[in-house]
Amino acid sequence: LYQGLFPNGLMQVTPDYFSQSYLLGDVNYQTVGLEDKGAIMETYSDLINSLDDKTNFQLTIFNQRVNLDKFRKSVLYPLHEDGYDTYREELNRIMENNLEAGENNFSAVKLISFGKSDQNPKLAYRSLSQIGEYFKSGFSEIDANFTLLSGESRVNHLADMLRGENHLPFTYQDLVRSGQTTKHFIAPTSLSFKHKNHIEMDDRLLQIVYVRDYGMELGDKFLRELMQSDLEVMISLHAKGAAKSEAMTKLRTKKTLMESQKIGEQQKMARSGVYLEKVSQVLESNIDEADELIKTMTQTGDKLFDTLFVIGVFAEDEDQLKHSLDIIKQVAGS
């Protein structure tokens, strides 16, 4: 829910909270050498750590099923009878084969959004634009496009997510003619919450799951494999940095509590005649991660972020939904 969406792309979520969204282009990460991969990861790290504790960060990846008929019209070469049709037919045949093999059936849209509180829309736009320009400059160093979304673009992307193909391209002229708000062009025609675990949204089902117990550093393997699983999913990673002193205090307190828990478990086992220096593998791993995180933050100045990692799974029916969830669990466990 939000209160307003301006043509310049600024969204007023509440009277004093605003957000901007940017479209992130592809980064040729898989095919570059180790040195270039290191530079890419360092750029990401520097950009994320530049955010203060008043700015919310959100990465959204929408793996959208492509309408094959529309896709064919947009990519296949028309024949012109000019002597080059043999080459066009060969290229068209290659693309048709890729479609049949399922290699081009999904398109991933990557969005980065920033949000923060401010006194009014003008100040919020200026503040958020400064953050966006800094990120744009950083991404340009690794040849990645980073484009501010206008209000119309944000509406159309949100409509793609929530309405699928059941919407026409939106323009602000439509508001003038219809007397409606941008929400009318985004919201599904029907929503049903009668099921415990999923939502009926027009002719689709949507279930939201969240990822927990992931490591201190979340690698790209999970996201990459999820994107390659031929599932229509919407991945959303929310993060907000904490002030360094507050984060260090929180980490040390958590480590102390875990060490106390470890001692308690050792004493409990000793009373039953068993003594082990190491106890629960998960607990030992969490203590080691806390140690490593404190060391890293002290040496590098990296920040600690509170994160929420959720996945929206779309399906045509309950059987397909169950199948998709099983695949996600397999990918998460690998």
Which functions belong to the PLM regions below?
Residues 1-334:
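Extended, folded cores of ATP/NTP-driven motor/assembly subunits in large transport
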